[in-house]
Amino acid sequence: MKKNHISLGGAMQYKKLFTIPFIALSLFSTACAVQSGNVVGKESVYPPVANFSFEIKIKPLSDMDYQAIITNKKTKKIQIIESMSHPPLTADNLVQIQDLNNDGYPDIILKGFPVAASAINGNELYMFNPETKQFEETKDITQLGEIHASGKNCIYVDYRKNSMEYSQDHYCWRNGKWHFIENR
């Protein structure tokens, strides 16, 4: 009687042929994810700013959702802002700190997704409120686009007007809010 047997050498050889490329592919995709900053759960801290009494950490929640965790260094009070953007979801890519209204307090611009299939990102502007000691999203800016400083107490927002044209709305800070000045 002839016994059936499986050649372990052949099975092991097949396993090696399958396993080695699988491991190589896994390492490659992990390296790409780390290089792009697209590792869910890995926090990054915004670079220190002189006399800035807050620490800002970016915590990716998925490949496009993130939390900006803002900690007051003095009171240890935490504020969390959730937003969306494209990778890399790192603090140095998503956060800008600037005193846009020249009130002596820092303001935060968070970068979002490109708007209307364009190269312009939809930024969110958070102004520091000294009474609440929190950053509050401004409601005075009507267009979603990239926000830039343009002189003392003024900003402009680049945005896509339609499928062919881009535009800029200019605002200046007066009496505690942003006032529309002109469109260019």
Give the ranges of each region predicted by the language model:
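Acidic, small-residue rich beta-repeat scaffolds with periodic aromatic anchors
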Residues: 9-10, 16-22, 30-64, 147-184
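Hydrophobic beta-strand segments that make up the repeating blades of beta-propeller
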Residues: 108-112, 155
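Acidic carboxylate motifs that coordinate Ca2+ or other divalent cations, activating on Asp/Glu
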Residues: 103
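Beta-propeller blade repeat segments, especially FG-GAP/WD-type strand-to-loop junctions
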Residues: 71-75, 118-138, 169-177
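Calcium-binding motifs, dominated by EF-hand helix-loop-helix domains
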Residues: 96-100
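Repeat-based blade/solenoid architectures
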Residues: 37-39, 83-94, 140-151
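Beta-propeller fold detector
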Residues: 80-83, 136-141, 180-184
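Residue-level signature of beta-propeller blades and closely related beta-rich strand-turn architectures
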Residues: 112-114, 161
